[in-house]
């Protein structure tokens, strides 16, 4: 996250987690001098941060003018709060979105029977599951998008969705902003001018991801309405939310309906895309139920949560890359974040999978997802089942604490998952720490990234107590220790009150009913307090 010595170009690209390019580029940074800088430019912004070209910081755009804001904090959290006041606060995701998501994976073969076998497996193993996601092959292959269920695989989609709802599940489906030439919708979209064009008057197309791919023009109000109606039909059928994939590979030689500069639209396109989808969800589901799962973003995109890290390999290196990228994103005003638990590309070892599950279920949002193989725990080993169950139940029991922090995120812009330096700015040991994080204002989590089960982590000054074991440790020190798979360094900051729910089988329940308050290392004469939100977000305030 420390960019000193780097050249950083703000330019969205589809690059996975193991490259210098990024799906989400935000022209914003903060410094240890008490201020942040936001460059208000939709196109490419180039930053030289004490690189070989400049001694300090320089940023430039290819334009006739440059607008930027200097934001005084003085603390990093205050800078982020003011930055999101300027560019938009993150919306509050629904409670159910904080539970465990399971997917079909990307290019696997599946039908309703396959999906039922996964859901049955979770129920039989007592693993709480909140959301089931259908990736691209809910539609007929290479007709993406046609917004129609593949009848060969899903002959009764409305009935299927109703059956899943009766089992207490929410349903997500994969979409993108593309219309393939094979899609039955292509002719209509071309005829009515809903697609990006070339300067010769023809539709802009390429074969990068599927033959004859065209791109919806979200600067055209009629195209937005047309696209929205397709999504509304799915919501009426029983779909609850959408995974808004892609949005990065946007051409710089296209012609837009409203005459927009295609170079400036390259980064900004994803904002319009996700805004359209999020507005449909708010219209049909209500503001309290709107949530999507987005890969690409630009400044202001935090208003349309949730975002996930993108394509990563299934190994420890990529697991660590994912966290580092996530903390960079949340430091840029994005309040909620997720990643592909177990890794996306290839298939992880059981060891990596189990460690990633602990990390993933101690993230704001948790999704098991892969590319060519399924991510159900029993595909790895029986111990993996125990690990997923344990941490899924732990997260459910932490919902009173997590949801309080989620509400604060929506009010202030301060992220749920935050880098150590955001909370402990004066502690120089935290400046470069990107392998551990604060989950909310009281919990410190340090995932394990080694196959020898060794955890290496740092506790800042103060008294820290393990949430899992009750062990008390002195801060201002580094620790090295071995952990089993049902363990992770998870410590509570001194002076904290953590509200623990009475249930561990679901993310949605009355958090105030039967709640337990755990007080940690309270000092004499100091008053601590916490808040619990009940069924309709009413407050219950406790002072100790």
Regions found by a protein language model. Name each.
Residues 278-290, 297-308, 321, 325, ...:
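Catalytic core of carbohydrate-active enzymes
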Residues 128-388, 423-425, 433:
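Aromatic- and carboxylate-enriched substrate-binding clefts and catalytic-loop regions
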Residues 30-34, 41, 199-200, 460-461, ...:
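Short acidic-glycine loop/turn motifs at beta-strand connectors
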Residues 1-95, 103-106, 112-113, 119-124, ...:
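Catalytic and substrate-binding clefts that recognize carbohydrates or anionic sugar/phosphate headgroups
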Residues 24-28, 33-35, 66, 98, ...:
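Residue-level detector of short, conserved catalytic/binding motifs and their immediate flanks
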Residues 28, 83, 122, 164, ...:
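A residue-level signal for conserved active-site and pocket-lining positions in enzyme catalytic cores
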Residues 542-544:
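Conserved small/polar residues in nucleotide/adenosyl-binding loops
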Residues 111-113, 117, 132-135:
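Active-site pocket-lining segments that scaffold enzyme catalytic pockets across diverse folds
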């Amino acid at each position: 996250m420390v960019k000193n010595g780097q050249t950083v170009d703000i330019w969205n690209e589809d690059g996975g987690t193991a490259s210098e390019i990024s799906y989400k580029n935000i022209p914003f940074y903060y410094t240890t001098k008490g201020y942040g800088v936001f460059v208000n430019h939709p196109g490419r912004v180039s930053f030289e941060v004490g690189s070989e070209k400049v001694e300090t910081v320089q940023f430039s755009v290819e334009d006739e003018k440059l607008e930027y804001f200097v934001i005084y904090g003085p603390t990093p959290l205050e800078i982020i709060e003011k930055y999101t006041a300027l560019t938009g606060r993150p919306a509050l995701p629904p409670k159910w979105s904080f539970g465990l998501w399971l997917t079909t994976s990307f290019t696997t073969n599946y039908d309703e029977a396959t999906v039922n076998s996964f859901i049955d497996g979770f129920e039989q193993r007592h693993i709480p599951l909140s959301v089931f996601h259908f990736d691209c092959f809910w539609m007929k292959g290479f007709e993406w998008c046609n917004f129609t269920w593949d009848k060969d695989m899903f002959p009764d989609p409305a009935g299927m969705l109703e059956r899943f709802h009766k089992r207490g599940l929410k349903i997500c489906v994969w979409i993108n902003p593309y219309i393939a030439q094979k899609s039955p919708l292509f002719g209509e979209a071309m005829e009515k001018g809903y697609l990006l064009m070339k300067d010769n008057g023809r539709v802009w197309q390429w074969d990068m991801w599927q033959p004859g791919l065209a791109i919806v023009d979200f600067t055209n109000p009629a195209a937005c309405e047309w696209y929205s109606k397709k999504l509304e039909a799915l919501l009426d059928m029983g779909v609850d939310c959408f995974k808004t994939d892609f949005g990065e590979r946007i051409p710089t030689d296209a012609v837009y309906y409203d005459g927009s500069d295609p170079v400036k639209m390259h980064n900004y396109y994803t904002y319009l895309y996700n805004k359209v989808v999020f507005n449909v969800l708010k219209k049909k589901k209500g503001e309290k139920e709107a949530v999507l799962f987005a890969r690409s973003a630009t400044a202001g995109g935090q208003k349309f949560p949730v975002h996930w890290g993108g394509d990563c390999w299934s190994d420890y290196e990529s697991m660590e890359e994912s966290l580092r990228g996530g903390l960079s994103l949340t430091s840029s005003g994005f309040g909620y974040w997720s990643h592909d638990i177990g890794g996306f590309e290839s298939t992880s070892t059981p060891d990596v999978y189990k460690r990633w599950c602990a990390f993933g279920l101690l993230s704001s949002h948790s999704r098991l997802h892969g590319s060519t193989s399924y991510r159900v725990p029993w595909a790895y080993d029986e111990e993996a089942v125990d690990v997923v169950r344990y941490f899924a139940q732990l997260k459910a029991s932490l919902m009173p604490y997590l949801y309080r922090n989620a509400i604060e995120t929506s009010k202030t812009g301060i992220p749920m998952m935050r880098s150590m330096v955001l909370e402990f700015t004066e502690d120089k040991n935290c400046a470069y720490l990107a392998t551990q994080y604060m989950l909310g204002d009281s919990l410190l989590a340090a995932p394990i990234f080694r196959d020898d089960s060794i955890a290496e982590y740092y506790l800042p000054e103060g008294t820290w107590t393990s949430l899992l074991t009750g062990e008390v440790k002195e801060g201002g020190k580094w620790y090295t220790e071995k952990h089993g798979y049902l363990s992770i360094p998870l410590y509570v900051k001194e002076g904290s009150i953590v509200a623990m729910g009475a249930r561990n089988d679901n993310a949605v329940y009355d958090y105030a009913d039967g709640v337990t308050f755990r007080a940690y290392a309270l000092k004499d004469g100091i008053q601590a307090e916490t808040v619990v939100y009940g069924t309709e977000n009413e407050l219950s305030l406790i002072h100790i």
